[in-house]
């Protein structure tokens, strides 16, 4: 999450540096992470047997792959024949985890089983809907009309920079849209910006130890990105203005990206001593080639809308004067298409790389957790903030 906004520069002193270390470590604040021990893992194995609802074949394959990775490490079996469908599916799921460490696979297995257990014990739909609606933030607007769930970044005075609560609200909005009668979900921004990424001014209330904060942040980031990987319906970005940081890297997980000709795309990770997230270390080279991906992810090159289109990050660019009218007219037409056909087609397009995306996301979050605790990251962000750059 490389994007930062800051209200004003201040004098730096040792006490401020200590606060800043904590702020960087808490770039994402979430629920306390479980440090999955062998006992936690064994408990999760027993818990799977007690699930009241069948989680479905896709989740079963994910559980199988994580179990094998956690107990045996990277896939070491010969690839089954094409007609051995069951074992081929298992092999693909395990092999997609690549070199994911055993400890991370064990943690992911425990987290997945925990989420399955929680969902099986969830309250009735009516009560849950009322409770979840009350948790929505004014900074994320969620509306549904004409079969479209519109999710809007709504902090125009902060250039739509994302707060901790906004991350949680987006996870919730996607969860709800995945199971209701929505045909597609569309993201956009209020005001001049689409989204300026993460807002460091929200970290001043951070408490607790640095390592714990970084660990919690990695959990929230992983869950946030997984909510995009898991979304089963068409996912569209309507990029009305400049986009920075995670609002850019997430675009590789969208099914369509429509941009105004005044939009720009910027990922200043190295400038902040950080590393890519939202699976961009995988999706960007796949979309635009290694050299162009490196320009963005390593060297922080800012792309215009036309450049982003030429490199495959953007589906189509529209003149600012007609952007809203043209895009929303088209989306309303798309929303009238048979929803199950679109959902099934998306599943066919995405399913073969889904486990790969989970693995990449987990590895990126582990790497970022370490980066947030590094001196290089602390110093880079301090330098960035003190210069008050224009996004």
Swiss-Prot record:
The record marks 277 as: Important for catalytic activity. Acetylation of Lys-60 is observed in liver mitochondria from fasted mice but not from fed mice. A motif (Microbody targeting signal) lies at residues 389-391. CDD domains: ACBP, crotonase-like. The modification Phosphoserine is found at residues 99, 117. Residues 149-319 are annotated as: ECH-like. Residues 116-136 are annotated as: Disordered. The modification N6-succinyllysine is found at residues 49, 53, 60, 68, 79, 88, 90, 127, 159, 286. Residues 1-36 form a transit peptide. GO terms for molecular function: delta(3)-delta(2)-enoyl-CoA isomerase activity; fatty-acyl-CoA binding. Residues 37-122 form the ACB domain. The keyword Mitochondrion applies. An acyl-CoA binds at residues 64-68, 90, 109. It catalyses: a (3Z)-enoyl-CoA = a 4-saturated (2E)-enoyl-CoA; a (3E)-enoyl-CoA = a 4-saturated (2E)-enoyl-CoA; (3E)-nonenoyl-CoA = (2E)-nonenoyl-CoA; (2E)-tetradecenoyl-CoA = (3Z)-tetradecenoyl-CoA. Pathway: Lipid metabolism; fatty acid beta-oxidation. One of its GO terms (biological process) is fatty acid catabolic process. Transmembrane segments: none annotated. Expressed in liver and kidney (at protein level). It comes from the Eukaryota. The modification N6-acetyllysine is found at residues 49, 60, 90. In the C-terminal section; belongs to the enoyl-CoA hydratase/isomerase family. Able to isomerize both 3-cis and 3-trans double bonds into the 2-trans form in a range of enoyl-CoA species. Has a preference for 3-trans substrates. This is Enoyl-CoA delta isomerase 2. It comes from Mus musculus (Mouse). The gene is Eci2.
